[in-house]
Structures are given as structure tokens and as C-alpha cells.
Regions:
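Acidic, divalent-metal-binding catalytic cores of TOPRIM
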Residues: 1-242
């Protein structure tokens, strides 16, 4: 919760306090949220002694159609009949498409901010969605946030760069992007979950995505994720070297 800078400071302090004890390897793992750009290739992203997940948040590893199918199969409940993996796949894409401009705005704000003091949303946080998700609405709300922050911090608002980034991400988030399931990597999973939950409970009122997460964590398999597998191998090598 402290962000990458807070976590690094904590680890440096802990490492210093333990310096007189036996040799050890100290590493951290965190999601990148909007603090660090997502690389084109999924893999190990180690900065100092902090490892960043490839996907936007930890929930992005859980909010996947396969996990819904596994959970529903495990519950073996007739209540969720018809909520197949294919249906969840389509609903996930529908939900993500509704958030296209909002996610473009959040990504752009994350890249233009000079510190974590500037948020990437004008709502109370991830999962709290704006009332209006249109392209112009997200653009104007972002510019207001950026300008207000710049005035308070005594900075020059980089609106030109924001405009360029926003346009680029709006174009990037096209049909091919969603068909390749890249929204599962790029979009803030808490935001997508909020929209998806409404779509699912409209038909299956008793269904909870939180239960899917619990099931997915209990049965988590890192092998589909190159970055996590690299991390596992990296840690194993460090342990062997001790």
C-alpha cells in the first residue's frame, strides 16, 4: 500500500538493521499499478531489489475467464447454469470496452505525473467509477485534475503531452487489443470487476467475483504467466546460491 518508493525505503531500512546478521537476499514484489509502464514483453522486471508484476495489478492475474470456469465447476451449483467460460470471456470484453476511455485517461495521467501525489483518477480510487465514461468526459475530467494539481504544486501542466498520450491509448485500445485479451494485462482489474459484477448479477444475482478470487488464489498456478515463472526461477536460484 505504500507504493514503490515507500516499499523501497522500508526494505532499505530493514536491510540496514539486519546488516550485522547472516547474509540474506532481500527482495520485494509489487504490482505496477500506474506507477510504471507495462513492457511489451511479459518477463522479469526487476528494479533494484523490487520485482514488478507484468500485469497492472495482482487482481489482473485472477480476473480471467478460466478462473470463473474453475470456480463454477468446483461449486457444482445449478444457480450459475449458463455462466460458461465463453460467456464470461465475452462479458469481460464488453466490460473492458466500456472502460476504454477511462483506462486511456488513467494510463496517460500515470505517465505525465511527476510524482505519486497526482492520482490517476478523479474518483475516490480504483473500483469507484465515474458517472460518465465517454471519450470527451474522461478527457475533460483528466485535464481538470492535471491542471488543478499543477496549480497547487506550482508546476506547469503538461496538457499537450497528456493529449498526445490519451489519443495514442484510445487508438491502441482497439478491437484487436480486446480480441487478444490485452485488457486483462493493461486495464485496472478493480475497475473492470466493478462493471463485470453488475453484468453478471443482472442474470445470476447470487454470483460473487470475490469468491472467484478466493478460489483462484487457493488454486493458483503461475505457469501461464512468464513474469511470475521468471520470478519463481530467480528466487530459486538465489536460494540455491545461499
Amino acid at each position: 500500500g505504500a507504493g514503490k518508493n515507500g516499499q523501497r525505503a522500508f526494505m532499505q531500512g530493514y536491510e540496514k538493521a539486519q546488516a550485522a546478521t547472516a547474509s540474506r537476499v532481500l527482495i520485494g514484489f509489487r504490482d505496477r499499478d500506474f506507477d510504471r509502464a507495462i513492457p511489451e514483453k511479459a518477463g522479469l522486471d526487476l528494479v533494484g531489489n523490487i520485482f514488478f508484476s507484468h500485469r497492472r495489478t495482482i487482481e489482473n492475474y485472477l480476473l480471467r475467464p478460466e478462473n470463473f470456469a474453475s470456480y463454477i465447476s468446483a461449486t457444482n451449483s445449478a444457480k450459475f447454469q449458463g455462466l460458461t467460460e465463453a460467456v464470461v470471456h465475452d462479458l469481460l470484453i464488453e466490460s473492458a470496452k466500456e472502460l476504454k476511455f477511462y483506462q486511456a485517461a488513467r494510463q496517460s495521467l500515470g505517465e505525465v505525473r511527476v510524482s505519486n501525489d497526482l492520482g490517476t483518477t478523479w474518483t475516490s480510487g480504483s473500483g469507484a467509477l465515474p458517472d460518465h465514461l465517454g471519450a470527451d468526459d474522461c478527457l475533460s475530467s483528466s485535464l481538470s485534475l492535471l491542471t488543478d494539481y499543477a496549480q497547487k504544486a506550482g508546476l506547469i501542466s503538461d496538457t499537450a503531452r497528456f493529449h498526445a498520450l490519451y489519443q495514442d491509448y484510445c487508438e491502441r485500445f482497439n478491437d484487436a487489443f480486446f480480441e487478444a485479451r490485452l485488457h486483462e494485462v493493461w486495464f485496472q482489474a478493480k475497475d473492470v470487476q466493478k462493471v463485470l459484477q453488475k453484468k453478471i448479477t443482472a442474470i445470476w444475482p447470487q454470483f460473487s467475483i470475490s469468491r472467484v478470487y478466493e478460489h483462484a488464489i487457493s488454486n493458483f498456478d503461475p505457469t501461464p504467466f512468464p513474469d511470475l515463472m521468471e520470478f519463481v526461477n530467480w528466487v530459486s536460484q538465489k536460494i540455491e546460491q545461499q
